[in-house]
UniProtKB/Swiss-Prot annotation:
The keyword Glycoprotein does not apply. This is Eukaryotic translation initiation factor 3 subunit J. The keyword Nucleotide-binding does not apply. GO terms for cellular component: eukaryotic 43S preinitiation complex; eukaryotic 48S preinitiation complex; eukaryotic translation initiation factor 3 complex. Residues 30-50, 93-102 have a biased composition (Acidic residues). Component of the eukaryotic translation initiation factor 3 (eIF-3) complex. The gene is hcr-1.
């Protein structure tokens, strides 16, 4: 075999059987760009969702605040309308009550009277001071309004008068209860009652506070003693003056009687008519 033919066969054997493809660089860049666009779209969607949620919450808060403001700022006309609606409701209940029994009617009237009395008492002492905290109801605070109806009662501890907090409110309580209790002083058991009552009222005070109260009572006792002594002296003087006047009258009467006897003896003797 000649050398030229050998070279040709060697070149044919070393030639590639299939063509070599170029790397798909362009395709990879396109895919990366698409993925970046998708991520950006997701981020934008998340941001939009957050903004919508914030806007929704802000709108709800604003609506709630406006509703509360409207509820707290009712006009006079609105309040009147509400009261009229309440009256209409009560009238409707009264019309429905036409079919109620006599016992049910008495019970309804009793309940309405009790509510009316309580409302009247609260209105009477309105502004004195109201406590929002409801205390446990004690049996001693329940007062029977109607002696014939044991169920017709009222809890006086709920009245504003008995929940004072300021000096003025305590003064009002004193001026209200003082005359009511003081008018019982002529009764025979009043002194013992007042002793026990004062002791009960002051039992939770400190010793120095009780001493102040005792000093006030001592001063009152001294004033009363002076008044009683002055009245006693005045009575003695009046009695002595009255006794002196009576004695003087008796003395003058004796002199007149004596003169009358002398006149009868001297001027009109029995011998003068002989």
């Amino acid at each position: 075999m000649s050398g030229k033919k050998w070279d040709e066969e060697e070149e044919e054997s070393s030639a590639p059987n299939s063509p070599v493809l170029a790397p798909g660089r362009r395709r990879f860049d396109d895919e990366e760009g698409n993925e970046s666009d998708v991520l950006d779209s997701w981020d934008a969607a998340e941001d939009s969702e957050v903004e919508r949620e914030k806007a929704k919450k802000a709108a709800e808060a604003k609506a709630k605040a406006e509703a509360e403001a409207a509820a707290n700022k009712k006009s006079k006309a609105q309040r009147i309308a509400e009261r009229q609606a309440e009256r209409a409701r009560q009238l409707a209940e009264d019309s429905d009550a036409e079919e109620e029994t006599e016992a049910e009617r008495r019970e309804r009237l009793r309940r309405e009277q009790k509510e009316s009395d309580l409302k009247h008492a609260e209105d009477l002492f309105a502004g004195i001071g109201i406590s929002n905290d409801r205390k446990v109801v004690s049996k001693g605070t329940i007062v029977q309004i109607d002696p014939k109806d044991p169920n017709n009662t009222i809890d006086i501890s709920t009245l504003a008068l008995f929940n004072p907090t300021t000096k003025t409110q305590f003064e009002t309580l004193r001026t209200t209860l003082g005359p009511m209790i003081g008018k019982l002083s002529p009764k025979p058991h009043y002194t013992l009652f007042l002793q026990e009552f004062s002791k009960q009222l002051a039992k939770d005070l400190k010793s120095d506070e009780i001493k102040k109260i005792a000093s006030t009572l001592t001063a009152l006792s001294n004033e009363k003693l002076k008044e009683e002594k002055a009245a006693e002296k005045g009575g003695k003087k009046s009695k002595a003056a009255k006794t002196k006047t009576s004695l003087a009258g008796v003395g003058r009467g004796g002199a007149i009687a004596e003169a009358h006897d002398t006149y009868d003896d001297d001027a009109f003797g029995d011998d003068d008519f002989m």
